[in-house]
């Protein structure tokens, strides 16, 4: 709408599409004619699934986005150990592993404590689905007292996570942590959030829209910005991390604050990708969902 473009679909199209949806539970195969489909928990975000498709004696696994390692929200995916004819697998981080989670959490918590004690605010631009909710759990696991402010689309998603808490690894802890935070629902609440002495978790993760970008203008000199997810080159998040600038209202704003990145990725690292492939023992492998060069290099390596 802002760009003056019209969406090619509307609410009536969504409602029509819903008629053809078939909800499925994890680990419960559904057979249509001669094709069987089973979804397994991918350990990525709420609802993410690894698909196992069987057709006339052949098996195909589509990993989608997955993570084997346990996080604050998910128990982690299990590998496919029955052998498949073809594996379609993500390659987002096929060239490296992620840092140790426990050490990274401790480092993150220590920086929050230092910043808050100095009277500053930690702004965490975060993805609405998954990352925002996990940050709440991480922060609360290390501090019960630091104020947390949740803003943007993350608020609605947080309620959805609570509604489907049975799919989380520690559902009651998530609900308790959610009840302990401040939901930002007005401009006054946003001003209070930047007064210093807390953590703001807000969309958008790449700072392309959402309230996060506007918070930067009101942070005091003791504050800092901490990214916890990938920012595509050319986005405001990438720009801030690499140049110390932000595009706001078609102007470049110099941001004189520390800007950091913590790798709390919800994707499998290189070692887990290799483990998944080894356990699945596929006849063929198709590498997808990654930088083109990275995916090609991984495919060549697997040959």
Identify what each model region corresponds to.
Residues 35-40, 160-169, 274-276:
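Short, surface-exposed amphipathic charged segments that create phosphate/polyanion-binding patches used
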Residues 277, 281-283:
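Proline-aspartate-enriched helix->loop->beta-strand connector
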Residues 1-148:
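His/Asp/Glu-rich metal-coordinating catalytic cores
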Residues 108-228, 232-234, 288:
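Hard-cation-handling environments
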Residues 99-104, 176-189, 204-208, 243-244, ...:
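A general structural motif
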Residues 296-303:
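Short acidic, glycine/proline-enriched helix-loop-strand junctions
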Residues 247-276:
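Generic long, charged, amphipathic alpha-helical segments
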Residues 220-254:
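Redox- and metal-dependent alpha/beta enzyme cores, enriched for Fe-S-associated oxidoreductases
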């Amino acid at each position: 709408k802002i760009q003056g473009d019209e969406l090619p679909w509307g609410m009536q199209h969504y409602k029509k599409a819903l008629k053809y949806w078939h909800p499925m539970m994890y680990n419960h195969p559904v057979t249509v004619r001669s094709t069987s489909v089973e979804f397994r928990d991918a350990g990525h975000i709420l609802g993410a699934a690894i698909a196992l498709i069987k057709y006339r004696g052949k098996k195909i696994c589509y990993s989608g986005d997955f993570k084997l390692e346990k996080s604050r929200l998910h128990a982690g995916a299990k590998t496919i150990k029955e052998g498949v004819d073809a594996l379609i697998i993500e390659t987002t981080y096929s060239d490296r592993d992620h840092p140790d989670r426990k050490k990274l959490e401790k480092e993150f918590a220590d920086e929050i404590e230092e910043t808050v004690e100095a009277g500053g605010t930690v702004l965490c631009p975060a993805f609405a689905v998954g990352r925002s909710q996990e940050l709440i759990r991480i922060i609360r696991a290390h501090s019960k007292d630091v104020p947390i402010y949740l803003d943007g689309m993350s608020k609605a998603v947080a309620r959805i996570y609570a509604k489907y808490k049975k799919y989380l690894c520690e559902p009651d802890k998530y609900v308790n942590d959610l009840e302990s935070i401040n939901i930002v629902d007005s401009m006054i609440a946003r001003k209070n959030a930047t007064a210093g002495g807390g953590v703001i978790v807000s969309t958008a993760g790449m700072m392309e829209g959402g309230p996060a970008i506007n918070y930067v203008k009101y942070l005091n000199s003791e504050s800092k910005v901490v990214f916890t997810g990938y920012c595509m080159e050319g986005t405001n998040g990438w720009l801030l991390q690499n140049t110390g600038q932000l595009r706001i209202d078609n102007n470049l704003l110099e941001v004189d604050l520390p800007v950091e990145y913590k790798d709390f990725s919800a994707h499998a690292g290189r070692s887990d990708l290799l483990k998944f492939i080894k356990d699945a023992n596929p006849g063929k492998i198709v590498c997808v969902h990654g930088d083109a060069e990275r995916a090609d290099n991984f495919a060549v390596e697997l040959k």
